[in-house]
Amino acid sequence: MKKKKIILFGVILAISITFMVGCTTSAYDIAVKNGYEGTESEWLASLNGTDGSDGSDLTITQIYNEAVQNGYERNFFEFLDEYLSLEYSPDSSEAINRCMRSAMIVQCKFNKRSYGLTRGEEYGQQGSGVIYAINKEQGSAYIITNYHVVYSSDSDTQTRVSNEITISPYGGSAISVTYVGGSAQYDIAVLKATDDYFSSTFPLAINLVNGDVTIGQSAIAIGNPAGEGLSATQGIISVESEEIIMEDIENSSSYVSTRVMRIDAAVNSGNSGGGLFNSAGELIGIVNAKSSDTSIENMAYAIPASIVSAVADNIIKNNGNFNKGTVGITITVTQTTGYLDENDCVRIAETVVISQVSGAASGLLQANDVVKAITIYGQTITVNRMFHLTDPILRTLPGDSVTITVERSGQTIDVTVVCS
């Protein structure tokens, strides 16, 4: 059942940092199950021996045999790959420090609408943002934040978007930015800044995650909680994808459905628009909401990176206007199955079927076609979930061509559609 949530207005907050929870059963996991009580770093140190003596007496084969005797079930080469690739870090400081270099405080000033001759009262609200793209030669950058951070229904501007927005990097001064464009439906806004700061070596653009996130994955949140400055917190991904109902930003009397990830981090005003990162420092989402039920704690939400990047790219390519292409199909999920992937992570597989065809897809696609893949701008994405189809289409503009691979009457067919 979809549940009503409330988006974060005003000062937005810093969220969660976490450590990666692996989906595989590692040699260290086996050791713990068999009574080992130390940390992974202490376990690794025990394998190396003390003062260079004990460890030198052990061979990798002996270590493998010991692991097998204690329940390890993989072959020697898998063990060798795991053992040699183990990286221990006492904390997530490396990822946090990198992510902090792409984080921004976002501050907006507004004047209240006034129906008299005098200008309305001035007020402000704060949030967070991330550097989406940077041009060192030009000293410019695109910044992503939430639309609700830069928008206020009480504003006296025609668009209700602030016309006085600044960003502040970690340890840096405020930089004026211009509003490029945004989408209230997807709660994404794009800002552009030009300043010598962006020609320096300190600022970094975010790295986007490649692929889907998993339950239990670490989530490092960098933001501006309560307007107190950039900081980091930690949590995990509780649900990798779900639909929630939120109040329409531009129309408080209506509601919109949006796809989000659920995280267990405590979210407070000030972190909206801030980045959610994995343990590798890759952007996995943008924090935007929390539960409106005051009796519920540690239930917050983030817009997935696949939506964030698609909407931002659309806005940038289309000169500030979000205008996605329309394929002309209605899709539904007819079957859902849980399974384990190659890393023993729990996943969901959905059978995505076309239920209605209209517009651009008329005469090309058919009802009951099972969608297998979509190719956009030369990139083919296998459709195992409904959002594998819907998210990439957000990147397209009217006139763009997409190829949809479907299964029809036992045959696989590639169908190219020009978006309307």
Task: Label the model's feature ranges.
Residues 166-168, 208-230:
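Short glycine/Trp-rich loop-beta-loop segment that forms part of the substrate-binding cleft
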Residues 87-94, 113-144, 174-176, 232, ...:
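A conserved glycine-rich beta-strand in the N-terminal activation segment of trypsin-fold
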Residues 133-186, 195-196:
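Catalytic-histidine neighborhood of serine endopeptidases
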Residues 13-18, 54, 69-72, 192, ...:
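C-terminal recognition in membrane/secretory proteostasis and scaffolding
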Residues 23-86:
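Collagen/collagen-like triple-helix sequence repeat recognition
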Residues 104-106, 129, 141, 145, ...:
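Terminal peptide-recognition signature
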Residues 112-113, 118, 122-123, 147-162, ...:
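Active-site loop architecture of trypsin-fold serine endopeptidases
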Residues 115-122, 170, 180-186, 241-261, ...:
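Gly/Ser-enriched beta-turn/beta-hairpin loop segments
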